[in-house]
Regions:
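Residue-level hotspots at or immediately adjacent to binding/recognition sites across diverse folds
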Residues: 2-360
Length: 360
């Protein structure tokens, strides 16, 4: 059965005046209050030392004027000045309706050239509850993750939020220069937005210090359980600081018992190619109970830059665990700058049939 062609809207940006120094990154997506509308979040110039957080409410249409896309409403978002932030990046939303939302992300700090420490971190996560445009000053809360060693992280990112829980990662290491993910053993956690309490995500088997997990997406199954998506990576040799293998994963979390179950990993196109590192960037659950995962796969070798954006569909077996064979659909995206096919694309978030990401 043939698939319908992709409808691509690119660029979709907030760049008043079309400045050549501004790049808009679309990082999180949920449904809006009205049919055909969305709640979209991201940042200008993220990653970077001083990103500007963004929230968009409206349809993802092709209307554009003077560098501003869409017929909806854009808002710039920043954590309160009291946080001492250099910049804000919004990674995930949860639309609560009637103009209210939960937002999660991270903010950068200016260390004036000093190395980060647990007492003086470089990047700190945040959670927010309030008006969708970020204007509720008392709705912001910093999140500094606790690593497996029990120390406060120097880098904390809160990636996704749904149903009152958020997931993220914390570490005392920088990110890998090839994949953009943590190169050392990263600590994935859950944070309760109401209480601020953190819980480590417990993966099965003995914890190998050479294996790292990230948590980039969480979905409330509305039965007391949540499903978490992310990536697992392994450094093949001690002393090698970069991730050398990687697969996307899903794991279930029971918020009542605190139990984790059904951990399953997924290689790019079911191991059709073994030279790519794959990572799930978010999660969406259909009405039929299947999960759509926006995924990014990057080259394992350094022969050339390649980034493949995909949407992966995973279903459950009758006994409730995940079927190991997933359906992968690669997204063929053209660059808005010249109309050529992108060789470096990411799929960052998913809602319904809509994927947002980046192409270069």
């Amino acid at each position: 059965m043939s698939r319908s062609p992709l409808k691509v809207t690119s660029p979709f940006e907030y760049n008043p005046g079309n400045s050549s120094e501004v790049v808009t990154y679309l990082q999180g997506l949920k449904g809006g209050d009205l049919p055909g509308t969305f709640l979209l979040v991201g940042a200008n110039n993220s990653p970077g030392p001083a990103p500007v957080g963004l929230v968009y409410q409206g349809p993802l249409d092709a209307i554009s004027s003077d560098g501003v896309s869409g017929s909806g409403v854009w808002s710039t978002v920043a954590v309160p000045a009291s946080f001492g932030a250099a910049g804000t990046s919004v990674y995930g939303p949860d639309n609560l309706g009637e103009g209210q939302a939960n937002l999660v992300g991270a903010y950068t700090r200016n260390l004036n050239g000093d190395s980060p420490t647990p007492e003086d971190p470089a990047i700190v996560g945040f959670v927010y509850a309030g008006a969708v445009d970020g204007s509720s000053e008392d709705g912001w809360r910093s999140v500094q993750g606790i690593t497996q060693l029990g120390t406060s992280g120097t880098y904390t990112f809160v990636h996704s939020v749904d149903g009152g829980l958020a997931v993220g990662n914390s570490d005392n290491a920088d990110v890998d220069d090839l994949t953009g993910y943590f190169s050392l053993s990263s600590t994935a956690f859950i944070v309760d937005l109401e209480t601020g309490a953190q819980s480590l995500i417990r993966y099965p088997g003995q914890r190998d210090p050479l294996v790292t997990h990230t948590a980039y997406g969480i979905w409330d199954n509305e039965d007391g359980t949540y499903t978490i998506a992310g990536g697992s990576g392994e450094r093949l040799k001690r002393g090698n600081s970069r991730v050398d293998t990687g697969e996307g994963y899903l794991i279930d979390y029971d918020s009542v018992t605190g139990r984790f179950s059904n951990y399953t990993t997924f290689a790019y196109r079911n191991r059709e190619r073994t030279d790519l590192i794959s990572h799930f960037e978010g999660i969406y659950r259909t009405k039929g109970g299947a999960y759509r995962l926006p995924a990014t796969s990057v080259a394992l070798n350094r022969k050339g830059d390649v980034g493949i954006a995909s949407v992966v569909t995973v279903k459950r077996n009758k006994r409730g665990d995940f079927k190991p064979e997933a359906n992968w659909r690669d997204l063929k995206v053209t660059r808005s700058s010249d109309g050529e096919m992108s060789v470096l694309s990411t799929a960052n978030s998913q809602f319904g049939q809509v994927t947002v990401g980046f192409a270069n």
